[in-house]
Each structure stands twice: as structure tokens, then as C-alpha cells.
């Protein structure tokens, strides 16, 4: 039987668990009163396995039709924290007419060129189905509706070949974004390596990463980029966050990722991108201080919570949700 809890009650429990951990400037902690009709549904399971993933996907898959892209961060070579291959394989084989999709990177590493990227895919075990590197044949511009930074954004050309998208995300920290949830997975991950990622990062034509855009302006760029993908798919896009092996570093870091200090929490899923990322943050912020500290420092020092508040401003979803355990 589904077990339901509204966000206000969840956050009350979170505050008790946090104790003395400071969250004073965390906008997400302000839960307004609302009726259940005002809330988005977020589904949760503690079962981080193929079975758990299939069970939670069944709660959100009503809009999935036609050719389905499974957007996954496939990681740098030998990354210790990437999602388990067998779990991802179980989902992909369950979804008809589906395959994994990725894009090349802006930074010069083992996923910078399509040839190197394909070798990395083999190294990391992503060989149980086709993996479409969406910018292999170039990019296209798609509109950003209501953006204040962009009117359009460059994405991998092959994205237009798909009818639906499942955003399957390893939720964790991120060097520049503070945290990497569903928003980051498509805001950066669907932008092509040659142009779109450069637009989001406001990166000059050099390898001086220190000069790339940071803080709230970067979060806003990332949100607007993601909005373009969401608007493109309409009601045929869903979001799954796996809260497992949550290093402060993204899977971009590969073997250099910082050690994991936080426990695994489970899988969250929704048809609402803001709700699923908000619920993920709320759940992480409920961790004991010893497990939360490094993640919280990474998130807040990078102004990562601006991802959530700007998604709300852009009317991309609801930060009030009903958490349903399945």
C-alpha cells in the first residue's frame, strides 16, 4: 500500500533530525500551507535495485510513448559511483523502443570526442543496448520560452529523433552546480558539447575552467537550458533520482571523486522536475550532520539551491509535494 506524507510533515521531521545543522538561508525549508490538490506527487522507494526502479517507474510512465530516450550520465572511466549497470539495464529492457542517450563534454577528457566517448562507454559497461551520443552529428537550436538569459539553446541534434524521455539521474554533489539532480542531467546533459554547454557555462574559447560562469547566474543558465528540453517533450518526460553513493563530486570526476560520507537513501520519481529535485534535497538535508556536512557545504557554497528557486520562478514545477512510499 502507498504511504503518503506531505512535504510540511516531512520537513518537520527533517528539522528534528538536523538538530544544530544550520540551514538558515535554505529557501527550500519554507513550506507553505497548501491542499493536497496543490501538490505534485513524488514517489519513493528505499529499494535501490532493478526491481525498485521498475516499481517506481510504473507510477510515472503513463505519458511515455514512441521512441524513448533514457538520459543517463554514463560517467568518466571507472567512476566508482555511477549507477549500477544491471539496474539501468533492467529499466532499459523494460521500456519498449528505448535506448540510453548522452552528449559529449565541453571539458577535454575521455568523453570530449565521440570516439573517446564510445571507448568510455565500453569501459563503464554501457554496452547492453545502443547508446546514442546525441551530438555525434551536430546540434540544433531549440527555443527557451520565457528565458531572461537565452531565447534558444543548442542541444544534440539526435534529441529530435525521440518522442519521450526518461531522465534517470544519479543524485549527488557537483563541483560547479552544488548538486546534480534531474535539472543538471538535462540542463547540461542534453546541451551539445561544442556549443550548448559553452552557452550554459558562458565559457570562453579556452580551457581556463576558472573563468566559467559560477554561482546563481550559472544555475539560472542551467535551468533555462533544461526548460527548453522539458518544453520540447511536453508531458512525455519523467524524472527519476537515485540517491546512492552521494559524493560531493559528480560522475564527471571519475576515480578522483571524493569519498562518499552519506548513506544511500533510495529512489525518488515524479512527472514534476522541481518536485523531484526539491524532495531529493529535503531528504538529503534530513541526514545527520556528520553525513550532511560536506554535501551541504558543497551545495550552498556554489549557490546550488538557486536551481530550485529559479525553476519555481520559471513555472517549471511545484516545490510543494506529496511523498508517496511504494
Protein language model features and the residues they cover:
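N-terminal secretory signal peptides and thylakoid transit peptides that target proteins
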Residues: 1-18
Amino acid at each position: 500500500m502507498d504511504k503518503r506524507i506531505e512535504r510540511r510533515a516531512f520537513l518537520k521531521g527533517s528539522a528534528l533530525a538536523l538538530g544544530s545543522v544550520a540551514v538558515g538561508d535554505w529557501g527550500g525549508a519554507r513550506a507553505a500551507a497548501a491542499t493536497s490538490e496543490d501538490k505534485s506527487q513524488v514517489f519513493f522507494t528505499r529499494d535501490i535495485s532493478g526491481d525498485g526502479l521498475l516499481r517506481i517507474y510504473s507510477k510515472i510512465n503513463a505519458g511515455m510513448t514512441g521512441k524513448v530516450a533514457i538520459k543517463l550520465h554514463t560517467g568518466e572511466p571507472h567512476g566508482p559511483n555511477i549507477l549500477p549497470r544491471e539496474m539501468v539495464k533492467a529499466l532499459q529492457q523494460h521500456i519498449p523502443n528505448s535506448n540510453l542517450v548522452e552528449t559529449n563534454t565541453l571539458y577535454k577528457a575521455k568523453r570530449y570526442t565521440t570516439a573517446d566517448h564510445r571507448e568510455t562507454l565500453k569501459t563503464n559497461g554501457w554496452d547492453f543496448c545502443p547508446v546514442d551520443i546525441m551530438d555525434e552529428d551536430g546540434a540544433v537550436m531549440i527555443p527557451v520560452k520565457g528565458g531572461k538569459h537565452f531565447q534558444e539553446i543548442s542541444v544534440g541534434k539526435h534529441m529530435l529523433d525521440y518522442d519521450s524521455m526518461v531522465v534517470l539521474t544519479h543524485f549527488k554533489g557537483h563541483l560547479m552546480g552544488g548538486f546534480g539532480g534531474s535539472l543538471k542531467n538535462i540542463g547540461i546533459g542534453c546541451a551539445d558539447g561544442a556549443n550548448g554547454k559553452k552557452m550554459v557555462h558562458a565559457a570562453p574559447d579556452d580551457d581556463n575552467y576558472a573563468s566559467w560562469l559560477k554561482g546563481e547566474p550559472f544555475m539560472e543558465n542551467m535551468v533555462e537550458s533544461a526548460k527548453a528540453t522539458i518544453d520540447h517533450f511536453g508531458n512525455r518526460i519523467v524524472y527519476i533520482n537515485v540517491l546512492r553513493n552521494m559524493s560531493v563530486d559528480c560522475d564527471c570526476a571519475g576515480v578522483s571523486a571524493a569519498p562518499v560520507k552519506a548513506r544511500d537513501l533510495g529512489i525518488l520519481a515524479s512527472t514534476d522536475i522541481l518536485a523531484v529535485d526539491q524532495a531529493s534535497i529535503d531528504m538529503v538535508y534530513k541526514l545527520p550532520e556528520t553525513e550532511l556536512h560536506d554535501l551541504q557545504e558543497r551545495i550552498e557554497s556554489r549557490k546550488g539551491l538557486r536551481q530550485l528557486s529559479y525553476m519555481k520562478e520559471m513555472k517549471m514545477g511545484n516545490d510543494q509535494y506529496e511523498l508517496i512510499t511504494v
